[in-house]
Each structure stands twice: as structure tokens, then as C-alpha cells.
Amino acid sequence: MNGKQCFCFFLFHLFYTGLFACGKPESSLAPEYFDLAHAYVQLHRYDEARDYYMRAARDPAYYHAAQYNFARVCGLQNDWKTAVHALQPLYDADSANATIAAAYAYALLSFGETARALLLYQQLYERDQKNTQRILEYANVLVHAKKYIQAVEFLRQKKSLLSEAEDVRVLQSIVRKLKDSVPPHLIADFVSTDDL
């Protein structure tokens, strides 16, 4: 095949694929956009991922998943304001969804909305009081909100549930934050190496 034939074949291929793509509504391309966005995330090309998640979100069938992943990518870029705005409609539509509520709470906390995040983490904990992840998240946010005594008392009550190695590691990290953040006389009765 010579150069002229290759060029003609390329034009024919371009015209042929363009003809079918033009007749295809953009929302039906949502699966491809979603997959492209995911691939861009894997390549750490977050701006492109954001663009394709937004395109995928135009299709109602992909809206929730694309919007959630868009917010996640915003978080990876430390764009917490956009992440909060992306997650808020999802949370408003389904506040009982623990995955969305936890992501929204984390974005709020990272954006500096500590009071709102604390309320959400408290609600998440109250829904599932034996979930060690929820216990540790709530305790960590209490420390972040400078509610140190409340955090110590809460951890003392829940310590018996925190027996897994990872839970103990996170607990020790929270205790270190308490010790670093609070004058010793304020927590002397609450925190000791043996007590927590």
C-alpha cells in the first residue's frame, strides 16, 4: 500500500467512525468516558480524569459513580472545596449511604469544616457503634476538633473493641496526638500508657 492509498484509507476510516460517533448521543459514551477517567487516575493524570468523570456524569446511569470518583480525584489533588461541592448532592440524595457520608465527612474535614465533619462522623459512629473504623474516625475527629477530654473518655469506653493490630496502631497514633496537643496536667487523669 503506497502513501496515497494509506491516506485514503485513513480518511475513509475517519469518516466512517465519525459518521457513527456523530449519531451516537454523548450520554451513551458514558461507559467509555468512565473507563478513560479511571485509566487517567491510574496514570496520575488527574486533570484529564476529572474531565472524563464530568463527561460520564452527564449520563444519569453514571451520575453517582462518576460524581463520587470525580470528588475522589479532587481530593487526590487537594481540591477539597470542589470535592465537597461534588459530594454534597450525593449526600443530600442518600444520607444513609455510609460510603458517601464518610467521603463527604472526610472532604469537609479536609476543607476545614470541622464542626460539620464532626457531626457527620458522630452520626456514622452512632449508626454502627461496633465498627472499629467508625470508632477511630470519630475519636480522631474529636482530637482534630480539640475536644481532647471527650476523645480520651470516648477511647477509654471503646478500647476493648480495638483489638486488631491495625486498630491498635491507629489508637496509638491518636494517643500520640493527644499527648502532643494537650498540656499533661489536662489529661493526666485520662491518658497514661497503661490506661489507653
Curated annotation (Swiss-Prot):
Keywords: Cell membrane, Lipoprotein, Membrane, Palmitate, Signal. A lipid is attached at C22 (S-diacylglycerol cysteine). It is found in: Cell membrane. One of its GO terms (cellular component) is plasma membrane. Its main location: membrane. A lipid is attached at C22 (N-palmitoyl cysteine). Residues 1-21 form the signal peptide. Disulfide bonds: none annotated. It is a lipid-anchor. It comes from the Bacteria. This is Uncharacterized lipoprotein TP_0449. The lineage of its organism: Bacteria, Pseudomonadati, Spirochaetota, Spirochaetia, Spirochaetales.
